[in-house]
Each structure stands twice: as structure tokens, then as C-alpha cells.
């Protein structure tokens, strides 16, 4: 168990921001929120009351994985000051609705796949499809509490044919990206090294990877 104080972070706002699909709300009462998060092969329970957070991991795991995941080295207070002193009323209004949102530093492969699933979809359906993909691929997290996100080569072929997964027309695109990444194991590492424009073009080369999703 590890406790920490963090300003400018709201678990509920992050969970509902549409950037992550492996957060499960465990509890919400008396202004306390608790979520389970699966990422990087780990499973974390995290609760929040005000700016106080309690986590199921120890300090070493927090510093090794979750600190960077929650982007704690970025000064969101400074960003807030710039927004609040700007002349942009639309930006101020948007910030007032999501002042606790942080840009999560998620696993690149998970983002590539989940945002393909997100095309022309809604958050509850996306979340369900991602949950089923992880469960039916059967790769356990390190502590055995849940399922890790399947890497290339870890998804049984029949999953792409199973209509109950909710992939719809996206099933063929998912099959293609999994096969491509398995056949080209350096692709993700090379993608990380590219400029924004080159990375965008590389993603758009993949089957039906739309610009909005690639971005």
C-alpha cells in the first residue's frame, strides 16, 4: 500500500475522458472514488479523496511504472495558470469541466489497437470489446488479479471471427495490425523514433487507420 498527495488530478474525469479503456470503477461514495487500472502487465487499485490517493502498489512500483503513467513530471498547475490568465473564454470553459484530466502515458501497442476499436464507436462498447479481447486472450497480469493487454502473437485467431467480441467491421483491421506487428517486431520501436508527421503517415499506411484515430 502506498499513499501520495497529487494536485490537478481527478480519477473520474480521466476515466470518462475517452483516452483509456481499461479503467474499472470499483467504488464511488462520500466523494471518494476507487478504480482498478490494468496497464503494462500490471493491475492497480487506486482511490482518491480530494488530492489524497491510496494505491495497492508499493513505492518502488509507483516510481517505476505509475508515476510516469500519470504524467506526474509535467506541471499541470503551471498549465492551469496559463489557461486561467488567457483571453480564451472557450479554453477556460473547457478547462473548468476537465481540470483534473491528465494525458496518460499509455503503452503504445495498446493505444494502437484500442483506438482502432474506437472508430465509429462509443465508450461503453469500446470498453467491453477491449475487456473481452484481454479476457479471451488469457494473459494474466503480474499479480494475477486481471488480464494483461495481448501483444502481437498472443491473440487466438478465432477471436477475430467471434461476433460477440463486438468488433464488427473492425475485426479485419485488427487481424491485419496484429499479423503485421508480429511479422515486423521492430515496427513499434521504430514508430517511437519518428517525427510526428512521419509517425502519422506510418500509421495511416495500416489498413483503415483513419487520421483522427492515428492522431
Regions found by a protein language model. Give the residues of each.
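HhH-family (HhH-GPD) DNA N-glycosylase catalytic core used in base-excision repair
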Residues: 1-215
Amino acid at each position: 500500500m502506498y499513499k501520495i498527495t497529487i494536485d490537478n488530478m481527478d480519477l473520474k474525469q480521466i476515466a470518462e475522458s475517452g483516452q483509456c479503456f481499461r479503467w474499472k470503477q470499483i467504488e464511488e461514495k462520500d466523494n471518494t472514488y476507487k478504480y482498478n487500472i490494468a496497464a503494462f502487465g500490471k493491475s492497480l487499485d487506486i482511490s482518491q479523496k480530494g488530492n489524497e490517493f491510496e494505491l495497492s502498489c508499493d513505492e518502488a512500483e509507483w516510481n517505476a511504472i505509475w508515476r510516469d503513467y500519470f504524467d506526474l513530471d509535467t506541471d499541470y498547475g503551471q498549465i492551469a495558470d496559463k489557461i486561467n490568465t488567457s483571453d480564451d473564454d472557450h479554453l477556460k470553459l473547457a478547462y473548468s469541466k476537465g481540470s483534473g484530466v491528465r494525458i496518460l502515458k499509455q503503452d503504445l501497442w495498446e493505444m494502437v489497437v484500442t483506438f482502432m476499436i474506437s472508430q465509429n464507436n462509443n465508450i461503453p462498447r469500446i470498453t467491453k470489446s477491449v475487456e473481452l479481447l484481454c479476457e479471451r486472450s488469457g494473459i494474466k497480469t503480474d499479480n494475477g488479479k486481471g488480464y494483461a493487454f495481448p501483444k502481437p502473437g498472443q491473440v487466438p485467431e478465432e477471436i477475430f471471427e467471434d461476433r460477440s467480441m463486438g468488433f464488427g467491421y473492425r475485426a479485419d483491421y485488427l487481424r491485419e495490425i496484429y499479423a503485421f506487428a508480429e511479422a515486423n517486431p521492430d515496427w513499434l520501436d521504430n514508430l517511437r523514433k519518428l517525427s510526428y508527421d512521419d509517425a502519422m503517415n506510418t500509421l495511416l499506411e495500416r489498413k483503415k487507420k483513419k487520421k483522427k484515430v492515428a492522431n
